Amino acid sequence: MARTLEPLAKKIFKGVLVAELVGVFGAYFLFSKMHTSQDFRQTMSKKYPFILEVYYKSTEKSGMYGIRELDQKTWLNSKN
């Protein structure tokens, strides 16, 4: 019985591993895009504000302050 489950277990493991890698690379791409583009952050603030909040908190925890304030100032000035 254990022998027949081995190939299934390997397939499941590979599937989980691929899903993890896709998630890590997706998160890196999203962070990179938000970190380099204020316009993208503005789009994220309208569509997915909770994701932008995670970005702001993670950058503040890493010691990079002022991004949130700069964004808010720029967006407020662009409305006027």
UniProtKB/Swiss-Prot annotation:
Subcellular location field: Mitochondrion membrane
The UniProt record lists the keyword Transmembrane helix: yes
Membrane topology, from the record: Single-pass membrane protein
Keywords: Membrane, Mitochondrion, Transmembrane, Transmembrane helix
Main location: mitochondrion
One term under GO cellular component: mitochondrion
Transmembrane region(s): 15-32
Official protein name in the record: Protein CEBPZOS
Origin species: Homo sapiens
